Amino acid sequence: MKSLLKTLGLFIFFAVPVCLKAQTMEESLSKTLMKMDSVQNLSEMMNVSAQFDMLAAKWENEWSTNYYAAYAKIIASFIVQDNKKKDLFLDEAEKYFGKVKTIDSQNDETWVLAALITNARISVDGQNRGAQYGGIFNQNLSKAEKINPDNPRIYYLKGTSLFYTPEMYGGGKALAKPLFEKAKELFTKEARTSVLKPNWGEKQNLDYLKQCDEK
């Protein structure tokens, strides 16, 4: 019995810090994401991105911290106006993505993140980068879809791609709308039990649906 208690005592001694670490990381991510939701300009976004950088440095081997550090860089690239700076942000996002992929390449959100980075690259110069990155974008979403076909962000990103593609090249609102509708349905089914699982995109998806109905 004494031996068993010693064993249990050791287990508790080692298990408790692990739990506390996980809670601390989750709480830190949650607080930073709340700040990100209220960002009004590039300066505020840069501050949030710097906080995610610190979290990724503190928990360098965690999928979630590296994921959100990359995600923040992508959002910053959409906000900044200078194209060179956009690419610099995306270069930093790529570095974090490398860690994300190494930690868990079988996570569908890993490949959705890859597609989002590629989408951001295209948005810098759509006319000249569409051919360069379009195939990579589709490949990344295909990987995500094979792992989890019920991820709404897959169809949201497919929809945005078609939305901004001219009709003469096989895009347009009419083709994008069914994808946004599918994403909307899947967003309503998505569980939001933890910040460790990404759940972004629902509000933006609804905005695109409204634009699809505008004449």
Where are these regions (language model features)?
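Helix-turn-helix repeat elements of alpha-solenoid scaffolds
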Residues: 38-52, 85-96, 130-138, 177-184
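Amphipathic alpha-helical repeat scaffolds of TPR domains
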Residues: 24-36, 58-80, 105-125, 151-165, ...
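Canonical positions in the second alpha-helix
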Residues: 55, 100, 143-144, 183
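Bacterial Sec-dependent N-terminal signal peptides
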Residues: 1-29
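Hydrophobic, well-structured mid-protein blocks that either form specific transmembrane helices
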Residues: 87-139
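A contiguous pocket-lining binding segment that forms or flanks enzyme active sites
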Residues: 129-164
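Terminal, low-structured helical/coil segments at or just beyond the last alpha-helical repeat
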Residues: 175-178, 182-215
